[in-house]
Amino acid sequence: TYTVRVVSISDQGCTDTAEKTVIVYPKAKTNFTIGSTPQCILGNKFNYVSSTTIKSGTYTLNWQYGDGLTAGNVNSTSHNYSNVHNYNVRLFSTSNFGCLDTVTKQIKTLPMPNAGFTYNYDQKCLKGNDFQFSTNSTVSNGTPMNHNWFYGDNDSTINSTFGQHTYQTDGPFVVRLISSTNIGGCKDTLNKTVNVFPMPLASFTIDNNKQCFKGNQYGFA
């Protein structure tokens, strides 16, 4: 509350005084926190909590999520975004005397990678098998990625664009590639099956392995 005084002085030195009281109402100091940003677009959930304060009086809040959607007078709220983008989130406060304040913060949603890989063979005999794998995973914004290979026999290669493996036993094996972005850790997984065939066991018998040259006739089975 302030008192405004005006003093009028005539040319002859006569004075008069007038006073009036003015009131300056406080506005809220608007602020909010964000739970986590950036987040992967798949399964994203952004949590916002107001930390707005006011010296005296009350206020109401209004949220704008930056994608055209809003929330009313709530202290905390959460929101899911449908597209990969940078969003400006705004919180508005209005005091009970109509004083306005606002704050804006930016959040980001990140694209998911698309895991992919090629191999030199999808099947080999056990003896001398040597499988080689190469990733062709992509992500729309070109963010660097890590690639982890799991060969289906408790062996793996971590953080490599290429995988190479020799199997010690026959069987079908599921090769798994997990590609994840360096920023945000957004992940995609791709499985492919390779087959390792058992080696045949060569064996035969001879009915009589010692015979005279004349008239010899060997039988093999």
What is each of the regions a protein language model found here?
Residues T1-A221:
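Extracellular/lumenal mature domains of secreted and surface-exposed proteins
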